[in-house]
């Protein structure tokens, strides 16, 4: 287990962003890096995975299936220049310091097994009717250690042999997902059980539908879609890529940086 009393350890964030024909994920990551610096006080490294492929995902903006390249999360262990790392999807907007506080916990790697979708879109908490509990790779925390290296090596093996592992663990969806590979690797590495001591104590908050705007008002986050949602100041997983690639995202980030307290580095 890592020594939490070591003061010389470096901390930082790795954001994975691989562009597609429809979406400039790197541009989204660059705006999120500004939020990371402001709310977490940490440096950011943006990584475009080398292990790529093509999946399709359903777009809440267009109601159609679009290209989705999200394969290389297993590269994070080698890609991170930090001793202690937060891995983020580009579209998980950091709006508080709760992730940084989790570094006070003892762990080799820390996963999120809970997701709260605020606009009522339901997603099962398992990977299939007779499969394992879901894990969200939207945010993952880890420290460099032998246990963590084994975990990411196992994720890479599952990715290479995904058709086999998908059938073995009764995964319903045909698309490869980092979420599924992380869940299976965690289950195997924990002795073929669901070890909850490596789960984060809080959930990821997601807005799954199309978004018109996001703004701050009186210290709260106001998301406008088909109706308005008023949220506490908290990090938010935004599925609307149309919003994230519009000028509205930069305007929202500018508002956050100019009105909310900055965390000391």
Q: How would you name each of these model-derived features?
A:
Residues 48-80:
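Active-site-proximal specificity loops/subdomain of glycosyltransferases
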Residues 89-93:
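The conserved acidic donor/metal-binding loop of glycosyltransferases
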Residues 46-54, 94-96, 115-116, 199-200:
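Short, polar loop motifs at secondary-structure junctions
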Residues 20-27:
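A short, glycine/small-residue-rich beta-strand->loop->alpha-helix junction that serves as a flexible
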Residues 85:
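Short aromatic/hydrophobic "clamp" motif used to bind/position activated sugar donors
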